Amino acid sequence: MPFFLVLLHNSDMDQKLLAFQKLASTFKSHGYHLYLVGGTVRDYLLGKELDDMDAVSDATPKEIESFLPNIETTFAYLGSLKYKSEEGIKFDITTLRKESGYLDNRHPSQITFVKDLSVDYRRRDFTVNALYMDADLKIIDHCNGENDLKNHLLKMIGDPEARIKEDPLRILRAIRFHLMFNLEIDDALLKAMHNNFSLLKNITDAKIRSELNKIKDEQVDVEMKKDIFAQFDIANLQGVIK
């Protein structure tokens, strides 16, 4: 059982989890697995309201299209589909994958579909965002993320220096999660954030604006926000916020 007090009496959460279990049953009947993942599982463990449901499967987009009706396939070439259940619950379904070759400091140049969660989790950013949940609502954790969440610790999966060089926007995501969930930033991650802060110049203003606006809109501790913004001279980035 999770160590968190999960609010299963919450009717909205119940409805969404039941919709997931129903959808997972459909996948199983066709020989595939479906798991909830990332922020959906993190928020479930924290007892927070669930938004759209993020899920992963060992089925490819083409395989999913063969048995699941009314799916949106705009990003199928990237391994991602959108689906709305009969109950109106929205799911983002991504095929398990491995990513490599971040040539533009943002997007992988190579995506390879895989079958194993122990491979898929390595492409994710932070341990608290790399948790999976199966159809029985059992947590699957390959990187001690549940324990890090319990201990209010934000850690990068893999080498923080390399992962931030892949995508410098992870610096701002780390700041956002630090503030949103009161997570202490791991020393190695914090050092890598400072070392590579200048790489944010390679990210578009629109992407930076989006992350900063998410931070701005959160109900966060004022002193924590003031401290972390001062550490990283966020004021120089705030000029892109409209």
Task: Set out the residue ranges of the language-model regions.
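Catalytic cores of the polymerase beta-like nucleotidyltransferase superfamily
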Residues: 3-242
